[in-house]
């Protein structure tokens, strides 16, 4: 049983397969587990195991996702594969399965297709940092020149979406032949994984990032001062350190004079901890839910941004009718609803559309009525009367 051998002393990286329907994403995922299983680094997952992905719910949105784990000599991987295009859109936008990098699967028999482009754009918009290309079904193309042309086309496509098209590794594979155990194609899967090891950077750990905690509640403790509670999203905060309060009103600085967790006093709080932070010189009226406490200067408040948004279908509890430019919903950001306006939008392929239908994937420009601590890649929900009607990710900050 390979299960016993999984060690947790290797760095952990989250990846996934993306690309056009029927280009072999799931077959390739199965092939990776088949090849690595021979070295005791994975459990064999067959196409049917992966394809029958259970439904998951993330922020009320139903997504089908298969999770596979395996390891190489240097890393441990969690790999996500989605059966349908809509599942990818939802997955990448909600961040249900965060990806540190992705394997773009493109069939040599077809070349890049509509969803190949859409997935590259999505990867760019939601901030997937690195890609590796698996040129699949190469066993079905006899002419080496055709394969070279497809590779060139993919590289140009990647460059057009601001990925380093000339430098991204492109590996010729055949998922099917590798599963069937043909040595030449098994070696190609190993080559692919070596490329993934080498070119998908190791993610920075949450504790190593600059401190950020979204305020969930505020209390006043007589004789001691004001306490803000919440879950530390990233970084570390130590007693005596200066932090900045950002969002809703003008940013201001304060010093953390105490860190409490489960009624015990600590020297520091770190990413993942639910804590109360005692703040010097701050009145209860000065801070509120929706603000964030951060390492000074590490994040700034903004009102205007662009986002990639998935609009829920009626069956998912979304709207029953379309909306138009000028629509004013609430944007739920971290811990609070902020009213805003969707001033403009374009369709998934960048074309202009008059209205947005439930089930659409759009790029939109939003403007909030008050500034909120915002950064690229930040997730948000769009709500109307307390129910979620869309999920989004910030792709550009305007002002």
Swiss-Prot record:
PROSITE patterns: G_TR_1, G_TR_2. Pfam families: GTP_EFTU, GTP_EFTU_D2, GTP_EFTU_D3. Its EC number is 3.6.5.3. The keyword Hydrolase applies. Mg(2+) binds at residue 26. Residues 81-84 are annotated as: G3. It is an enzyme of class 3 (hydrolase). Residues 19-26 are annotated as: G1. Residues 10-204 form the tr-type G domain. Residues 136-139 are annotated as: G4. Signal peptide: none annotated. Transmembrane segments: none annotated. PANTHER family: ELONGATION FACTOR TU, MITOCHONDRIAL (PTHR43721:SF22), ELONGATION FACTOR TU-RELATED (PTHR43721). Belongs to the TRAFAC class translation factor GTPase superfamily. Classic translation factor GTPase family. EF-Tu/EF-1A subfamily. HAMAP family: EF_Tu_B. This is Elongation factor Tu. It comes from Synechococcus sp. (strain CC9311). The lineage of its organism: Bacteria, Bacillati, Cyanobacteriota, Cyanophyceae, Synechococcales.
């Amino acid at each position: 049983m390979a299960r016993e051998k999984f060690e947790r002393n290797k760095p952990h990286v989250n990846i996934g397969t993306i690309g056009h329907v029927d280009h072999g994403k799931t077959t390739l995922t199965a092939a990776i587990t088949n090849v690595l299983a021979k070295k005791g680094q994975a459990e064999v997952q067959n196409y049917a195991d992966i394809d029958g992905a259970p439904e998951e719910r993330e922020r009320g949105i139903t997504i089908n996702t298969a999770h596979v784990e395996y390891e190489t000599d240097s890393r441990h991987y969690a790999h996500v594969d989605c059966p349908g295009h809509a599942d990818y859109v939802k997955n990448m936008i909600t961040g249900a399965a965060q990806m540190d990098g992705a394997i773009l699967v493109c069939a040599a028999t077809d070349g890049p297709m509509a969803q190949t482009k859409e997935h590259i754009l999505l990867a760019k918009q939601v901030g997937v940092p690195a890609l590796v290309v698996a040129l699949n079904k190469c066993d079905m193309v006899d002419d080496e020149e055709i394969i070279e042309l497809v590779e060139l086309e993919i590289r140009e496509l990647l460059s057009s979406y601001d990925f380093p098209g000339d430098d991204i590794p492109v590996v010729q594979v055949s998922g099917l032949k590798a599963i069937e155990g043909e040595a030449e194609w098994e070696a190609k899967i190993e080559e692919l994984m070596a490329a993934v090891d080498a070119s998908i950077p190791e993610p920075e750990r949450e504790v190593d990032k600059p401190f950020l905690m979204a305020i969930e509640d505020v209390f006043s403790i007589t004789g001691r001062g004001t306490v803000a509670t919440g879950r530390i999203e990233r970084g570390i905060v130590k007693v005596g350190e200066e932090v900045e309060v950002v969002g809703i009103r003008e940013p201001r600085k304060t010093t953390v004079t105490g860190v409490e967790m489960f009624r015990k006093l600590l020297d520091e709080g770190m990413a993942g901890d639910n804590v109360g932070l005692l703040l010097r010189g701050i009145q209860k009226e000065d801070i509120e839910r929706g603000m964030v406490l951060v390492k000074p200067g590490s994040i700034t408040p903004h009102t205007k941004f662009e986002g990639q948004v998935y609009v829920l279908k009626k069956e998912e509890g979304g709207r029953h009718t379309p909306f138009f430019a000028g629509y004013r919903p609430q944007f739920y950001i971290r811990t609070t609803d902020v009213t805003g306006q969707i001033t403009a939008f374009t369709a998934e392929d960048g074309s202009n559309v008059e209205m947005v239908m439930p089930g659409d994937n759009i790029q939109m420009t939003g403007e909030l009525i008050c500034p909120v601590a915002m950064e690229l890649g930040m997730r948000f929900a769009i709500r109307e009367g307390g129910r979620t009607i869309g999920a989004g990710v910030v792709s550009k900050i305007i002002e």
